[in-house]
Structures are given as structure tokens and as C-alpha cells.
């Protein structure tokens, strides 16, 4: 299992794109809810559905869950989407240019870490807006060349959001489970 900042990275791919919700505070005005808008980071709740093919894979899920002591220890999960489309960058550089970064939402507000091709992870230090593109500055130099085909995912620091894990029998040998993760920022 790959580690980053002394935490495990869990690469198990969910069945479908995860459901992500934000925990915004709100107040009631009459019978209506009004969200308190804030530009500060909000802890996201990420819900993944998994299909477990056999008992050995089920035991892997259980041991990982028990190792993290449910809600106690944090770890990283990738976003399982190509979050950034990069322009070509050489190895050994600490910044790279991007044409697509989903800037209105996550890059300025949420993201702290990126993982490249599931081999190298680094912390995002700064994002600079330069005319038609953005430049992302990393803490560590890139160990390999990147281009538009490089898979660049957000790396999210999370904990399990429940104290138990439940598997439901599906078919002759498979099991289904749903895991909720809560984002943690400063651990």
C-alpha cells in the first residue's frame, strides 16, 4: 500500500462516481433554509459504493477498516476522476501549467494534495492565474515528465464516517457495501 505523509492511500475504486456533499451551516428564515455562505473550506462527506468479489477481498476491507479504528485514524483516497488537464512539463520542476482545473470550486478552496498517475503525490503550495492558463506550484519536484494524458487526481484526507461496516450479499459470491468518508483538513 502506498503511503503519503505517513498515511495510507486507499486506491479501491468505487462502482460509480462518488456522491459528494458539503457540510454548510444554515439557519431557518420562516420555513426556508438559508445557507451561510463562506469561502472557507467545508468538510465534504464522500459516499462510495463498492462491490466485493470474494471473501478474501471482503477480509481486506474489514482489516483496513479495523486498522483505521473506524473514525479514529485518517488516510487518503484519490478522487477517482481526472481533475486536472496539464500542459507538458519536464521532470524535476516544481510547477506546471494547466488548461483545466475546475477553478471555481475545488482548486482554490479545497485541494491540498495531488497524485500523479497513482505513483507520486505532492502538496499544492500555490496556484497562479496567468492569462489563458493556471500554474500550479508543488512542494516537491516532479520525478517524471507529465502531459495532457497524465492522470492527475485530487488526494483527499479522510476518515471513515461510520463506526461499523456492513456487507450485503449480492449474487452467488459477491457482496455490496457503502462507505462514507468525512474529509479532514489538519491532521
Regions found by a protein language model. Give the residues of each.
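Extracellular/virion structural assembly segments
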Residues: 1-133, 138-187
Amino acid at each position: 500500500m502506498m503511503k503519503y505523509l505517513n498515511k495510507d492511500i486507499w486506491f479501491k475504486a468505487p462502482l460509480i462516481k462518488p456522491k459528494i456533499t458539503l457540510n454548510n451551516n444554515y439557519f431557518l428564515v420562516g420555513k426556508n433554509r438559508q445557507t451561510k455562505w463562506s469561502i472557507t473550506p467545508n468538510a465534504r462527506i464522500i459516499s462510495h459504493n463498492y462491490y466485493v468479489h470474494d471473501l478474501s477481498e471482503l477480509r481486506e476491507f474489514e482489516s483496513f477498516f479495523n486498522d483505521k479504528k473506524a473514525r479514529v485514524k485518517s488516510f487518503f483516497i484519490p478522487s477517482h476522476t481526472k481533475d486536472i488537464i496539464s500542459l507538458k512539463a519536464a521532470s524535476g520542476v516544481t510547477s506546471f501549467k494547466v488548461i483545466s482545473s475546475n477553478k471555481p470550486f475545488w482548486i482554490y478552496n479545497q485541494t491540498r494534495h495531488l497524485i500523479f498517475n497513482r505513483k507520486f503525490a505532492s502538496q499544492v503550495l500555490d496556484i497562479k492565474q496567468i492569462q489563458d492558463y493556471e500554474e500550479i506550484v508543488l512542494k516537491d519536484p516532479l520525478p517524471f515528465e507529465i502531459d495532457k494524458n497524465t492522470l492527475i487526481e485530487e488526494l483527499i484526507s479522510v476518515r471513515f464516517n461510520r463506526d461499523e461496516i456492513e456487507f450485503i450479499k449480492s449474487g452467488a459470491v459477491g457482496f455490496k457495501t457503502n462507505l462514507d468518508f468525512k474529509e479532514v483538513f489538519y491532521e
